[in-house]
Amino acid sequence: MKTLKSGIFTLLGLLVLAGVPVQSVNAAETGSQPKIIAVKFHADWCGACKAMGAVFTDLRNKLDGKPVLFVELDFTNATTRHQAMLLASALGISPALKENPGTGFILLFDEKRQVTGRHTSRQTLKEIAAAICTHCE
């Protein structure tokens, strides 16, 4: 599973470096731009990340078909941290990383890349999904 995740992040990184906008990949599949980006700040060693469990995957499945881009930034080690920073830069959300250090939470970004919410394992799947869906209409 870790190899698959690393491969996906590597592919996204290569697309970014090759000049292929990440949003255009999403647009080609759905026919529209995302109205919200849900970004999970993750690290394998993070207790809060473990407490969050499969919520992010469940959100992705529950909101399939909605104009939501789900991204996981992995801060487990120097290599994954570097890739996470490159991906954040490509998405235009780098300033939020400085304002929201750490892991174990999900940030929601609107179309202008402004943070519209921060969610942790203290919120239920239903609560986080409702917060995301307020931007989907």
Language-model region placement:
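Boundary at the C-terminal end of the N-terminal hydrophobic targeting segment
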Residues: 24-27
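Short active-site neighborhood of thiol/selenol oxidoreductases, capturing the structured segment around
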Residues: 32-44
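Non-catalytic, surface beta->alpha helical segment in thiol-disulfide oxidoreductase systems
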Residues: 101-137
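Thiol-based oxidoreductase modules, predominantly thioredoxin-like and allied folds used
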Residues: 65-84
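Typically the conserved alpha-helix immediately C-terminal to a functionally engaged Cys/Sec
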Residues: 50-64
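Structural micro-motif
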Residues: 89-107
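Bacterial N-terminal signal peptides
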Residues: 10-19
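Positively charged n-region of N-terminal signal peptides that target proteins for export
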Residues: 1-6
